[in-house]
Curated annotation (Swiss-Prot):
Pfam families: GcpE (PF04551). It comes from Nitratiruptor sp. (strain SB155-2). Belongs to the IspG family. This is 4-hydroxy-3-methylbut-2-en-1-yl diphosphate synthase (flavodoxin). It comes from the Bacteria.
Amino acid sequence: MKRYPTKKIFVGDVAVGGDAPISVQSMTFSKTADVEATVEQINRLHFAGADIVRVAVPEEEDAKALKEIKKRTSLPLVADIHFNYRLALIAAEVVDCIRINPGNIGSKERIKEVVKACKERNIPIRIGVNAGSLEKEIEAKYGATSEAMVQSALYHIKLLEDLDFTDIKVSMKASDVERTVEAYRKLRPLVPYPFHLGVTEAGTVFHATIKSAIGIGALLLEGIGDTIRVSITGELEKEIEVGRAIIKDAGRASEGLNIISCPTCGRIEADLVKAVAEVEEKTKHIKTPLNVSVMGCVVNAIGEAKHADVAIAYGKGSGLIMVKGEVVAKLPENKLVDRFLQEVQKLAKEKE
C-alpha cells in the first residue's frame, strides 16, 4: 500500500513527511543538564544510525544546557517539554523542534507563546499526545480510548492552525498496541501532517520489540507513518536497530540485506545458527539492498536460492554457493561462509 501523502516538514536537515524516507529517532536517558553524558549518548545514537534525537527538558538547567549540547553534536535535536511552557521558549532558541504534550502544556496563551518562539526560528512543533496524560475534560468525556487521543490531537492541531502555524507533526502513543493503532488510523484521513509513530512505555527489549513490530509495523504496512521511535527501556542502540528492521521488513525501505534462514530441524547437518550469526555480523555494514539465503538442507534451499541474490545450501559436510539461482561452487562446510561473503561483497559493489 502506498504511503499517505503528508506535508513535508524539516527537523534540522532531516525531512519528515512527503516523499522523505521514514526516519528513526530515539531519546537520551541522561539528565540533560549533564552535558558530557548527554553528548555521549547522542553520539552513540548517531553512530548507531539515528536520524533525530530527543532530550528531556524538565528543568531550567536542562533548557540552558541545550546550547552547549547543540554545539557538540550534529543530529537534529528535539526538546521534550511538559508542564512548563517557559522551558520551550528557552529551548526554541537552539533546538530543531519542540515537542509539547497537550495534556499538560497549559492554556491557549502559553501555546501562543510557544508558537511565536518556534515561528521566529522556523522550527516545527510536535503535538505529542500520550494516553497517560490526557486533558481531564477530554478523558472525562471519552474515557481511556483511542477517540480521546484523537480529539486531543485535533483540538491542539486547530489551536496551532488558528495561530497560522502548520509546521506540525503528530504522535498519539499508548502503552497498549491496539489503542495506539486505532488512534493513528482514525486521525490519518483527517489531517495532512506527518505522523511520528511509537508505542510508549513498551518495556524491555523482548516486549518492546514485539509491541513495536506489531503496532508500528501494522501502520507502516497501511501506508501510515513518517518517522518512528521504538521505545525500549534503557537500550539506545537497540531502539535504532529494531526501528530500522521494522521499516525494512514492512517494505518501507530497501537498505541492507534481507537474510532468509530456516528455523532448523532434524535434517540439518551443519551449525546453521553459527553460520547465520556470522553472516549477520559481517554484512551489517552493507547498505546495498540484497536478498540472501542461508539454508540448512536441500528441501527448501534450492527454491529459496532461485529468489535470492546469493545463497548457501548446506549438506552433510559440504554445501553449495548459488548466485542468482545458479550453482557457482561446491565447498567443504568450513569454506562456505567465507565464499558466500565474497559473493555478497562482489554483488553489492556491482549494484552500488
